[in-house]
Regions:
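Short beta-strand element of the alpha/beta-hydrolase
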Residues: 63-73
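Conserved Rossmann-like nucleotide-binding pocket used by diverse enzymes
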Residues: 70, 99, 144
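Conserved alpha/beta-hydrolase
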Residues: 88-108
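N-terminal Sec-pathway targeting helices
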Residues: 2-19
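N-terminal cap/lid segment of alpha/beta-hydrolase-fold proteins
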Residues: 27-63
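Primarily recognizes the serine-hydrolase "nucleophile elbow" in alpha/beta-hydrolase
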Residues: 128-162
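The serine-hydrolase catalytic nucleophile loop
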Residues: 76-88, 103
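Catalytic nucleophile-loop/oxyanion-hole region of alpha/beta-hydrolase
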Residues: 78-80, 106-138
Length: 162
């Protein structure tokens, strides 16, 4: 009888270690943020604005979600030459929502390129910020831009409504 208990002990220990390892793997998997981008169309003043939103996996209850609007450059698109997607993912991992949009005549926008003006870009950002506030409860908002998008970001306080 003593021999049977001794041969079962290593198996019981191995089963316990396997169960602990499985719990650790499950916990790490559950804690990984599910921050996949979602392609949507946001109603704008001149029609729908193609956009990609990326939200953090979890946000503190009762707190407004911070938002970063990523503005592409001249003749660019919401992918931002491949730099905006990883940036959006990193921001989401740190609890910050992002939205990337295609301005008039760029990316998936169906508007004519002639509508690609700073005033229209600011109006699109207004629509995007308003949509994100109404739909996702976003609060403090920052604009980050590349090239022409950077120019818009620097002039937005004068041009935009938010």
């Amino acid at each position: 009888m003593k021999h049977a208990k001794q041969t079962r002990a290593p198996w019981i220990l191995l089963a316990c270690l396997a169960a602990i390892a499985l719990c650790i793997v499950a916990a790490v998997t559950l804690l990984q943020p599910n921050t996949k981008p979602k392609n949507i169309e946001i109603p704008g003043t001149r029609g729908n604005i193609p956009a990609a939103i990326q939200l953090p996996a979890k946000s503190a209850r009762g707190e407004e979600l911070p938002l970063v609007v990523l503005c592409h450059g001249f003749t660019g698109n919401r992918q931002g030459d491949g730099h905006f997607a990883p940036l959006a993912e990193d921001l989401a991992a740190h609890g910050i929502a992002t939205v990337r949009l295609d301005f008039a005549g760029c990316g998936d926008s169906t508007e004519p390129y002639a509508n690609y003006t700073l005033a229209n870009m600011a109006a699109d950002v207004d629509s995007v910020i308003g949509y994100m506030q109404a739909t996702y409860g976003t609060g403090k908002t920052a604009l980050v831009g590349h090239s022409m998008g950077g120019r818009l970001a620097s002039l937005y306080p004068q041009l935009g409504q938010y």
